[in-house]
Each structure stands twice: as structure tokens, then as C-alpha cells.
Regions:
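Intrinsically disordered, metal-sensing/regulatory segments
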Residues: 1-247
Length: 247
């Protein structure tokens, strides 16, 4: 195993550990814990805007060139449409957890609705976690700095995801959900090591992840009632932006 492969697999294991041990990444003060989570959201959003989104234009051009003879529908918009799809689908998953939607299930005599919502949302994020890990492994050939910035941003993003699920579902999530998410990350990394998807498919998935990350951080942490703090988000976004610009 090469040094790059070893570093990548270590990054995958550490990403998975965010879900396994994230519940202990909390301060005794709820206010301090909230500031940390909100700053993490800001940092991962900064990564999307300064690193992934600028790459989308390049990815769109590469996708168009790679698929010019495939007669695919709307090839010149495929990456951007994929990002939009990621945003919309994860908005739908987040919308399912809103109080008015969950209460509607109780009012119509469907006591199992809330558990179904949890399972659907968790399933979506299991697939998402595996996809993020897969893309990190496939992107590792760009060098250690690219791997490090991706790992840090997605690690902070997963802290937000883990905190949101733990806050909403408590013991139910701690008992099994976090283990499923950790396994998905490990599985995605394993698949990425041995299974190579076509380049145009990887570019499409990158767009999907960009849209999903923007939506998840925005709705999970910054929506009204979530307790997000502007200055913590600002500090996280600006701090990680400076890091990305510096390297």
C-alpha cells in the first residue's frame, strides 16, 4: 500500500469516527457546544463556495467533452442540475423532520409515521455518507493538500449532521443510527479504493454533493429555531476561507 493510499484510508476511518464518537465532542456549556457546531457549518460551507463550486464550471466543461458522443439530454447543464437535485432532495429529507409535518402524522392517527420519517432520513444520509467517502478516495490522487482540505471540511460537516440527528432523535440515533452512518463512510471508502466509476459519473456526483452540503448546513444549523449563531458561523466561514486561500 502506497503512502497516499494509507493516508486516504486513515482519513476515511477518521471520518467514520466522527459519527461513532461525535456525541462526546461537546462542551459542558450548551452555548459553547452550539458555537462549535455553527462554526463547523460555516467552515464546510466555505469549502463548498471556495473550492467545490469553482470546480463545478471546470467539471461541467469536462463533462461536456467526455460525453459529447453519448447523446445525453442537456449535457451542458448536467453538473449544475445535479447540484440542484442534491439541494432539493435533501431539502425534502429535512422538511420531513419539521414539527408541523410530524404533528400531521399524529393528527391523522399514524403513530408510526415519525419512526418512518427517521428511517427515511437516515437512509438518505447513509447513502450520502458513503458517497462523500467514495469521492474523497477517488479525489485523493490530487495530493495530500487536496485530501486534507476535503477531509477537514467534510469532517466538520459530519459533525453538524451527527449533532442534528442526535439532537432530534436522541437514544434512537445513538443506539444504531450513528453506527450505520459510520459503516456507510467505511463502505464508501472501501468501494472507492477498488471500484472506479466513469469520470463523467464522478463529476455528476460531485455536483450532487455540492448541492447537498449547502442545503444540509443551511437547514440543519442555520434555519430559524435551530439556535445557530451568526458570529460563530461567520468565524468558521472566514477562518476556513483564509486557510483555503493560503494553501
Amino acid at each position: 500500500m502506497s503512502a497516499t493510499q494509507l493516508q486516504t484510508q486513515l482519513a476515511v476511518v477518521m471520518l467514520a469516527s466522527v459519527f461513532l464518537f461525535g456525541k462526546w465532542l461537546r462542551f459542558r456549556s450548551e452555548s459553547r457546544s452550539r458555537q462549535w457546531i455553527t462554526a463547523s457549518a460555516g467552515a464546510s460551507v466555505a469549502y463548498v463556495w471556495l473550492h467545490i463550486i469553482p470546480e463545478l464550471s471546470e467539471a461541467q466543461g469536462a463533462f461536456t467533452s467526455l460525453t459529447h458522443d453519448m447523446r445525453l439530454p442537456l449535457p451542458e447543464f448536467r453538473i449544475y442540475l445535479s447540484a440542484l437535485l442534491g439541494f432539493v432532495l435533501f431539502y425534502g429529507l429535512e422538511h420531513m423532520s419539521w414539527p408541523n409535518v410530524r404533528l400531521a402524522g399524529r393528527d391523522t392517527g399514524q403513530p408510526r409515521r415519525e419512526n418512518l420519517i427517521y428511517k427515511v432520513r437516515l437512509s438518505g444520509f447513509v447513502a450520502y455518507g458513503g458517497l462523500v467517502s467514495y469521492l474523497m478516495v477517488r479525489d485523493s490522487n490530487r495530493g495530500i493538500l487536496s485530501l486534507l482540505t476535503f477531509f477537514l471540511a467534510m469532517g466538520l460537516h459530519f459533525i453538524v449532521v451527527n449533532h442534528s440527528f442526535g439532537e432530534e432523535y436522541g437514544d434512537k440515533y445513538d443506539h444504531s443510527g450513528r453506527w450505520l452512518l459510520a459503516f456507510a463512510v467505511l463502505a464508501g471508502g472501501f468501494i472507492g479504493t477498488f471500484a472506479l466509476l466513469p469520470e463523467h459519473t464522478i463529476l455528476t456526483l460531485l455536483g450532487f454533493v455540492a448541492g447537498a452540503v449547502i442545503e444540509n448546513n443551511t437547514m440543519m444549523e442555520l434555519a430559524k429555531g435551530k439556535g445557530g449563531q451568526f458570529w460563530a458561523f461567520f468565524a468558521g466561514a472566514m477562518g476556513y476561507s483564509l486557510l483555503l486561500v493560503a494553501i
